[in-house]
């Protein structure tokens, strides 16, 4: 089971993402953006990791979205192969039009705007541990394949532009109706509170992650590779054995591929 971890200039999370892929028993490989894109077809799945591709120039993800490798990823997505875009990877998937519907750019991941009590308390880059509620049906999405609806995960964010917005409210309504909202920022009890610090970036409907209509492509702003091992979790004595909740994202991809093959 071969997984390509796509590396663009400025990507900075490829190595820890590769560790997560391999720890789950998949054969991971860093795939540079300037390799012959036809070689991508040899892989069973793909992860576009976080970082700041092309230094986020113009806007986050837009330059990487124009690279030839993304046209090939679009074709592989149409063939049903799983893709997970994390943070900048999510931004690239949105800018390329693969998410949300595969028919062009319908969303934007705008600058973070933190609102509390009706007032803007902060803008821009924010790094913190967040709580996510899994809002999709079980097996609806390749990147959350093993999660139950309503399951709560603690996974960190680190971004300046994760505020998911749409100029047309019908786009958001379609995401809701088609069960494409995979993760939403929530309280520790699972409540959806549209206010900072629960909604960490001002995202519409507290959206933290979405899928395409077919469910094989997931884009999410939080970083599961940073919550993969238990020692990464925020505790007084962090070096404990075992795994954190982020592992479930990568295990989901593996299970999705296995069941798709059978």
From Swiss-Prot:
**Described function:** Part of the phosphoribosylformylglycinamidine synthase complex involved in the purines biosynthetic pathway. Catalyzes the ATP-dependent conversion of formylglycinamide ribonucleotide (FGAR) and glutamine to yield formylglycinamidine ribonucleotide (FGAM) and glutamate. The FGAM synthase complex is composed of three subunits. PurQ produces an ammonia molecule by converting glutamine to glutamate. PurL transfers the ammonia molecule to FGAR to form FGAM in an ATP-dependent manner.
Can you give the residue ranges of the Glutamine amidotransferase type-1 domain? 2-238
Report the subcellular localization. Cytoplasm
Q: Which InterPro entries match?
A: Class_I_gatase-like, PRibForGlyAmidine_synth_PurQ
Q: What is this protein called?
A: Phosphoribosylformylglycinamidine synthase subunit PurQ
Pfam families reported in the protein's UniProt record: GATase_5
Reported EC number(s) for this entry are 6.3.5.3, 3.5.1.2
What UniProt keywords apply to this chain's record, in alphabetical order? ATP-binding, Cytoplasm, Glutamine amidotransferase, Hydrolase, Ligase, Nucleotide-binding, Purine biosynthesis
Q: How does it assemble?
A: Part of the FGAM synthase complex composed of 1 PurL, 1 PurQ and 2 PurS subunits.
Q: Which biological pathway? A: Purine metabolism; IMP biosynthesis via de novo pathway; 5-amino-1-(5-phospho-D-ribosyl)imidazole from N(2)-formyl-N(1)-(5-phospho-D-ribosyl)glycinamide: step 1/2
Gene label? purQ
Record has Nucleotide-binding as a keyword: yes
Q: What one GO molecular function would you report for this record?
A: phosphoribosylformylglycinamidine synthase activity
Q: Which GO terms describe its biological process?
A: 'de novo' IMP biosynthetic process
Record the organism.
Methanothrix thermoacetophila (strain DSM 6194 / JCM 14653 / NBRC 101360 / PT) (Methanosaeta thermophila)
Predominant location category: cytoplasm
Describe the reaction catalysed, as an equation: N(2)-formyl-N(1)-(5-phospho-beta-D-ribosyl)glycinamide + L-glutamine + ATP + H2O = 2-formamido-N(1)-(5-O-phospho-beta-D-ribosyl)acetamidine + L-glutamate + ADP + phosphate + H(+); L-glutamine + H2O = L-glutamate + NH4(+)
PROSITE patterns noted in UniProt:
GATASE_TYPE_1
Domain of life assignment:
Archaea
Q: Which residues form the active site?
A: 87 (nucleophile), 223, 225
Keyword Nucleotide-binding belongs to the record: yes
This protein's GO CC annotations = cytoplasm
């Amino acid at each position: 089971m071969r997984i390509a971890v796509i590396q663009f200039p400025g990507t900075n999370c490829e190595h820890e993402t590769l560790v997560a892929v391999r720890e789950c028993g998949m054969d991971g490989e860093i795939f540079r953006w300037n390799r012959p894109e036809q070689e991508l077809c040899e892989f069973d799945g793909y992860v576009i990791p976080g970082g700041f591709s092309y230094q986020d120039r113009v806007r986050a993800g837009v330059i990487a979205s124009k690279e030839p490798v993304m046209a090939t990823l679009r074709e592989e997505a149409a063939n049903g192969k799983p893709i997970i875009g994390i943070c900048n990877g999510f931004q690239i998937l949105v800018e390329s039009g693969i998410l949300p519907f595969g028919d062009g750019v319908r969303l934007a991941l705008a600058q973070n705007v933190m609102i509390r009590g009706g007032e803007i308390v902060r803008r821009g880059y924010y790094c913190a541990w967040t709580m996510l509620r899994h809002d999709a049906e079980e097996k609806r999405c390749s990147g959350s394949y093993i999660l139950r609806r309503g399951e709560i995960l603690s996974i960190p964010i680190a971004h300046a532009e994760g505020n998911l917005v749409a100029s047309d409210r019908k786009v958001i309504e379609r995401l809701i109706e088609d069960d494409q909202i995979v993760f939403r920022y929530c309280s520790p009890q699972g409540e959806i509170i549209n206010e900072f610090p629960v909604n960490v970036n001002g995202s519409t409907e507290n959206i933290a992650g979405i899928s395409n209509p077919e469910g094989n492509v997931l884009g999410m702003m939080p970083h599961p590779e940073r919550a993969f091992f238990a020692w990464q979790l925020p505790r007084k004595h962090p070096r404990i054995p075992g795994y954190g909740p982020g592992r479930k994202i990568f295990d989901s991809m593996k299970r999705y591929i296995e069941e798709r093959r059978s």
